[in-house]
Amino acid sequence: MKAIAIVGSPRKEGNTEIITHHALKAIAEEGIETEMVRLAGLDIRHCTACGVCRQEEKCPIKDDVFGIFTKMKEADAVILATPVYYGSATSLIKALMDRTGHLSGQRRVFAGKVGGPLVVARRAGQNFTHAQLEFWFHLLGFYMPGSTYWNISFGREKGDVEKDEEGMRTAWNFGKNTAFLVKKLKA
C-alpha cells in the first residue's frame, strides 16, 4: 500500500511541505509507504484545451506530468497540497489538475482510490481552495476521508504552520483516516 502527496508550492520546505510531512508521518505510522512529490522545479505545462485527449485518450503535451500521473495511478491514496495564492490553489497544482482531463470521465483511472486536499493559508481563501481541490477529487472518483475539521492550516513565514495546533492536529487526523480507509478498501 502506498500514499503519494503532491505539493504545489513553489517554495521548498515551506509551510505546505511541513503540513504534508505531518500527514504523511501519520499515514506511515500505519504501515503504509509514503512519498512526497514537489511540483516546484518540474516541467508542468498548462492544458491548452486542444481536445486531443477526448479523441486519443492521451495528452500530446510532453512534460513531467506523465511521471506524476504514473505515480498517482500506482498509489492507493493521493493527497494534493497547496498554499493559497490570491484566493486559490497555486498555478502548479491547478495545471496538474487540469491535465487529468484524459484520465477522467469514462476512463475512471482514479475511481476507488483514496484522496484529499491539504491547504495552507496566511489569512483567507482557504475554504474556496479546499473546495476547489475536493471537487477535483469527487470528479475523478476518489473516496475522501474526513478529519476533525477541514484540512486547512494557517501560516505565513516558514514554520508558522507548526504554531497552528488545530491545523496540525487536523492534518494528523486526516493522515490517520486516510490510512484507515486505504486499509479497509484493500481488505
Where are these regions (language model features)?
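Short amphipathic alpha-helical segment that frequently serves as the phosphate-/nucleotide-binding helix
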Residues: 17-21, 130, 168
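Helix-loop-strand module that forms the ligand-binding subsite of alpha/beta enzymes
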Residues: 60-143, 149
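N-terminal beta1-alpha1 ligand-phosphate binding loop
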Residues: 1-32
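Cysteine-cluster motifs in flexible loop/terminal segments that predominantly coordinate metals
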Residues: 42-72
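Conserved beta-strand segments of alpha/beta enzyme cores
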Residues: 33-35, 58, 143
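Glycine-rich phosphate/pyrophosphate-binding loop and the adjoining helix
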Residues: 1, 29, 67, 138-187
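A short beta-strand-loop structural module common to alpha/beta enzyme folds
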Residues: 32-42
